[in-house]
Amino acid sequence: MEPFSKFFKSFRRYHRFHPLDSSSASDDELAGKYEEHLLMDERLKRETVIFKSRIWILLTITNLIILGITVSMIVTSHCQLYAGKNADLRPISWWSPILDAIEIPTYETTLNGTFFAKPEVSIAREEPGPENDADWEQYETIRTHIVSREDILRLGKDPDTVMRFDNDYWGFGDDAYMVQLDVMHQIHCLNMLRKAAFHDYPGYVPTGAHTDANNTHASRWTHLGHCVDILLQNIQCNANTEVITLAWVEGRTQPWPDFSVNRKCRDFEAIYKWQLENSVDAGKFDRMPIPHDAYVWPAPWENRESELGEKLGKHQKQEGVLGQAGHQHTKRHE
């Protein structure tokens, strides 16, 4: 408060009333006093400017301090929100039980983007046949996992319509719901497209799950169309930003793309291992009866306007918030 008191003391001193004795004061004395008052006014103006400047500096410093505290609180809350396992993945992922269960490693690698297969190839480059189909088959048994009602809400789904593990059959209690890893469904779809693409490969007869000898069957084409669509949506949703370089090669007048780009990847093997170690018995799942009190949706092939209660093309929910639209043609299994 010292600058304020000093300012007001100066103000009172410079503006104190000084009566003039007109009878005795000479012109020179009056002129001197007038100049003295002018100097006092100039000094007061300077001190007023300094005072205002100090006020603005003080306000600026105060605002900067408040801004710093606010930013610090926001950063701290953000760090706390994504603290724990998979802190780097959570901001770009919808909640999943596996994010809480294990730390999913990430690593840097160079993808094998060569046009011609290398000697040691992945199952995607193997010659189509029974052995190759068997390698793909390990991904076709999509395992099922247990989550709670609260977890279903975090997924943005309605627990009243999601399949539960019947306690009489499974013995998991009343708060046990069924989920499966979406990435495994994507690999299944890729395998479906692989079989369709190579169905006329010399000597190849597709085997394994979801193999239909009648390639013109309507449901098969619907299945393939679904797989193309779901893979495209996933590619677009997870659109990577890496770039491809180009090169000149002998005997070609057009650029040759180098698809072997450097990538940062999630460890799929860690996810696959978790799926195997934390799933219910697959055989028992296949033999599972429909519980008497199960929620049963109308058959999608009989109601083309909606599927599982959602208008087609209207899947735009927010995490943890259930849709407001009512379920259509809902019923309980009797």
Swiss-Prot record:
Q: What does this protein do?
A: UstYa family oxidase; part of the gene cluster that mediates the biosynthesis of the asperipin-2a, a bicyclic peptide that possesses two macrocyclic ether rings consisting of 14- and 17-membered paracyclophans. Within the pathway, aprY is responsible for the synthesis of the bicyclic structure of asperipin-2a. The pathway starts with the processing of the precursor aprA by kexin proteases to produce 11 identical copies of the hexapeptide Phe-Tyr-Tyr-Thr-Gly-Tyr.
Q: What is known of its domains?
A: The 2 HXXHC motifs are conserved in ustYa family proteins and might form active sites.
Enumerate the glycosylated residues: N112, N214
Q: In which pathway does it act?
A: Secondary metabolite biosynthesis
| Protein's recorded name | UstYa family oxidase aprY
Organism name: Aspergillus flavus (strain ATCC 200026 / FGSC A1120 / IAM 13836 / NRRL 3357 / JCM 12722 / SRRC 167)
Q: What top-level class of enzyme does the UniProt entry assign?
A: oxidoreductase
- Organism taxonomic ancestry: Eukaryota, Fungi, Dikarya, Ascomycota, Pezizomycotina
The keyword Cytoplasm appears for this protein: no
Q: Where is this motif: HXXHC 1?
A: 185-189
One GO MF term on file is: oxidoreductase activity
**Positions of short motif HXXHC 2:** 223-227
Q: Which GO terms describe its biological process?
A: mycotoxin biosynthetic process
- Similarity comment: family membership: Belongs to the ustYa family.
Instruction: Describe the disruption phenotype.
Output: Abolishes the production of asperipin-2a.
Give the UniProt entry's GO cellular component terms.
membrane
Region described as Disordered: 306-334
For the keyword Zinc, the answer is no
Write the record's keywords in alphabetical order, separated by commas.
Glycoprotein, Membrane, Oxidoreductase, Transmembrane, Transmembrane helix
